[in-house]
Amino acid sequence: MTISLTLRRTYNDHPRPEDDDKFWSIDCDGCYVGSLVLHQGPSDTPPDWRWNFHMHPGRHGNGAREGMSDCGIAPTRDAALPDIRRAMERYLEFIGPEGWAAHVAHMEWLKARKEATRKRENRA
């Protein structure tokens, strides 16, 4: 299975512009699937990059967390990317086309709900 993974900035209007490169969304074939964030631990340790998936594959995801990794840590953003790809490929294989369709439908529902809320707020 060939997938297209893309990183995009999570915040376009971050209150601290110097933090813009610390928060990324992970898209798979154009659909949001997770986050990649620069994490600063204790001051005596270097920061690391932490990623995790936010998937909603319905019943097709039952047992996914026990069977595979849906999160990880890497020393650099570039080092995290191959791990994210491997984990995403395994996750998609586990949930199958039905699980992926359930996730895409869930994300479309969230987008529609957000848009409806935005329209309601603009009328008030």
Regions found by a protein language model. Give the residues of each.
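Post-kinase regulatory C-tail/linker adjacent to protein kinase catalytic domains
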Residues: 102-108
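Amphipathic, alpha-helical segments enriched in basic
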Residues: 1-3, 11, 59, 63, ...
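A short alpha-helix capping/helix-loop junction motif
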Residues: 96-102
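Short N-terminal "domain-start" leader segments
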Residues: 1-50, 81-82, 89-90, 97, ...
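A short, exposed loop/beta-hairpin motif centered on an aromatic-Gly-Thr core
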Residues: 55-82, 86-93
